[in-house]
Amino acid sequence: MLSEKLHAAINEQINAELWSAYLYLAMSMDAESKGFKGVANWFYVQWLEEQDHAHILMNYLNSRDCKVTLKPIAEVRTEWDSVLEMYQETLRHEKVVTGLINNLAAIAAEDRDFASSNMLVWFINEQVEEEESARDMIFAVEAVEGNKYGMYQLDKELA
């Protein structure tokens, strides 16, 4: 059985993952509305991944005989001034999520809950990938900044 503290924190993380999914869906829809179908696809894939992360955590709580408590998902921003701004916000957000995951790992370590610590290793590694992916996209968009043909090509590659 999980400690009450870890159980509550994982339920909060489920909400954070679903909020992340909602954010990336909003980014996808905004990119699509501006004609960036490839960027929209990139964020759509992120939306699916974040839902998977929440599902993994829900399954984990169920496997440990703990109740999943779904809470309301807070409203997200729905418009951005540029594709670059979307990716910059993505990186900032993923850094926040990394902090949340690290907090879960710290609680599990404090509780000497080795099963939870082991499960969280996947999330820790995933966050390294998420931050790297966002940084890579910032670099790519900055590389073509001001070049409409370059942005068109980048968008096609992401489709």
Language-model features: where?
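Iron-associated oxidoreductase/ferritin-like identity signal
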Residues: 1-159
